[in-house]
Swiss-Prot record:
GO terms for cellular component: BRISC complex; cytoplasm; microtubule; spindle pole. This is BRISC complex subunit Abraxas 2. GO terms for molecular function: microtubule binding; polyubiquitin modification-dependent protein binding. The lineage of its organism: Eukaryota, Metazoa, Chordata, Craniata, Vertebrata. Its main location: cytoplasm. The keyword Nucleus applies. Belongs to the FAM175 family. Abro1 subfamily. CDD domains: Abraxas_2. Residues 377-390 have a biased composition (Polar residues). It holds the Pfam family MPN_2A_DUB_like.
């Protein structure tokens, strides 16, 4: 007995097994055929060899483990019919994928195989075991497979061959006898088969093959356009989803930024309010502690005479510039420091002129005024603008 599996079926099975998150199982669909080989030697001795070949065309995976049996290994026939439906007669075996295990059938798998052989009515039912092994450092991964045909005494291992997979010589390249199950192909053959096939199925004219080829190409183009349109729709939907996700992320970021800015402004406002209140309370306490600074000192003649350093008669009031005090108060009230300085300088000059005036009058009224008149007086101008007697 030998077995063969098509290349695309084997690659699909390996891809599904390698990308599965856990162990999984399913059924193998195909057919069993007999091959008769005649060998003739130089001595005209013929030899006939009969070989039973199991051809695996496709696989039908189950949704999860224990989908058609329980933990004790009892097969549920209703679940089995629901999975296989009308493909029950095409089942030639079943498979199981395990990770990091030995390539041997377990006791539960042997019980399941016996029940499936009885329920499906397939005496040549086979079991394909696929194992996935990786090294400790996960640098090397190996996918191993073995095909069993359980007997009464032991589990017989059957050689599994894959057409078009082997050496690159021309002899190894051959076409597998896999039936075509495409509905479009069957429809085209049914429409154009009468033109170039006889009743016995023999081809009439080779030129009609091009018509069939063109018809098949049109069908393929139509299907390709439909697939392309569906892919475009999926691509546009995916782009729209990505755009919406980007907008959501941007709005979330803007909202967080606004909240952070509002919080920082609130903190700055609170700090400024506290600082202003602290400064106001400090100024009020300082002003209360120095009440003499609140009102200017009263003007007295003794203070003016002591400042000038010259005795003046008591009946002479201190002359003031017209509007100087009022102007000074107004400027202080308006908060103009430069104007205050100007008024103060004008008042100082006025006081100095009045002081000179007092000195000259005092000399004129003194008893020695005659002698003073006889002696010449020289006035010199000092750098500060005051008049001094020499």
């Amino acid at each position: 007995m030998a077995a063969s599996i098509s290349g695309y079926t084997f690659s699909s099975l390996c891809f599904h097994s390698a990308n599965s998150c856990s162990d999984h199982e399913g059924f193998l669909l195909g057919e069993v055929r007999q091959e008769e080989t005649f060998s003739i030697s130089d001595s005209q001795i013929s030899n006939t060899e009969l070989l039973q070949v199991i051809e695996i065309h496709r696989h039908e995976p189950c949704t999860n483990l224990f989908s058609f049996y329980d933990y004790a290994g009892t097969v549920n026939e209703e679940s089995l019919d629901r999975i296989l439906k009308d493909r029950r007669k095409n089942v030639i075996g079943w498979y199981r994928f395990r990770r990091n295990t030995q390539q041997q059938m377990s006791y539960r798998e042997q019980i399941l195989h016996k029940q499936l052989t009885r329920l499906l009515g397939a005496p040549d039912l086979v079991f394909l075991l696929i194992t996935f092994i990786s090294t400790a450092n996960t640098s090397t991964h190996a996918l191993e497979y073995v095909l069993f045909r359980p007997n009464r005494r032991y589990n017989q291992r059957v050689s599994l061959t894959i057409p078009n997979l082997g050496t690159t010589s021309q002899q190894e390249y051959k076409v597998s006898s896999v039936p075509n199950t495409s509905q479009n192909y069957a429809k085209v053959i049914k429409e154009h088969g009468i033109n170039f096939f006889d009743k016995d199925g023999v081809m009439k004219d080779i030129r009609l093959i091009y018509q069939v080829y063109n018809a098949l190409q049109e069908k393929v183009q139509a299907v390709s356009e439909e697939v392309e349109k569906s892919e475009r729709v999926v691509e546009s939907c995916q782009a729209e989803v990505d755009k919406l996700r980007t907008q959501i992320c941007r709005r979330k970021a803007e909202k967080e930024r606004e909240e952070n800015l509002r919080h920082s402004l609130q903190l700055q406002t609170e700090d400024t309010t506290d600082c202003v209140m602290t400064l106001s309370s400090t100024d009020f306490i300082a002003a209360a502690s120095r009440p003499q600074d609140l009102h200017p000192p009263a003007y007295t003649e003794e203070n003016a005479d002591a400042k000038d350093g010259v005795d003046s008669p008591p009946d002479m009031p201190r002359p003031q510039a017209v509007g100087s005090s009022c102007q000074l108060l107004i400027e202080i009230k308006d908060g103009e420091p430069s104007a205050c300085k100007t008024s103060a300088s004008e008042e100082t000059e006025t006081e100095e002129s009045q002081s000179d005036y007092k000195k000259s009058r005092h000399l004129s009224e003194s008893p020695d005024s005659d002698m003073a008149d006889d002696q010449p007086c020289q006035l010199s101008t000092q750098p500060d603008g005051d008049l001094a007697q020499q």
